[in-house]
Amino acid sequence: MTDSKTEAAFKPVELYTDGACSGNPGPGGWAFVLRCPRTLKEIQRSGGQPHTTNNQMELMAVIRGLEALKEPCAVDLYSDSKYVGQGMSSWMAGWKSRGWKRKDGSKLVPVKNVELWQELDQQMQAHRVTYHHVKGHAGHTENELCDKLAVAAYQQYL
């Protein structure tokens, strides 16, 4: 998650993300709020797909948020997705070392959503990303906003 650049080279940003699905699988949406605490500049983006899963939309929200960064950043990522958090902090290194396979008992099987995990891994290379879990639907302002935007994004597919 960290490259050889010094800590001072990383601009601090906050990335809030959420994914939502109507049915799982079903129509889904993703959203992010990206904020620079130094300037208070903020961007919000969202999108959707007609047939997807909640986990795919959670991953897409983080990927699209990281893609929006134009320079190396120290990213504080806030998400209610334990799937994203565990994948980034615990599972991804092992998956990569096994050729993007996961252990299932004594055998190796393909990682679910592997294309998205690989895209996330690629996006993370330029940044220092720190995951922070927030409880969903618990009044966290930015998480609630992302949820609202993600739900609105999939409405067009209903």
From Swiss-Prot:
Q: Which residues form the RNase H type-1 domain?
A: 9-155
Q: Does the keyword Protein biosynthesis apply?
A: no
Give the Enzyme Commission number: 3.1.26.4
What is the official name of this protein in its record? Ribonuclease H
Q: Show the Gene3D superfamilies listed in the entry.
A: Ribonuclease H-like superfamily/Ribonuclease H (3.30.420.10)
Where, by residue number, does Mg(2+) 1 bind?
Answer: D18, E58, D80
* Transmembrane region(s): none
The record's PANTHER family line, in alphabetical order, gives: RIBONUCLEASE H1 (PTHR10642:SF26)
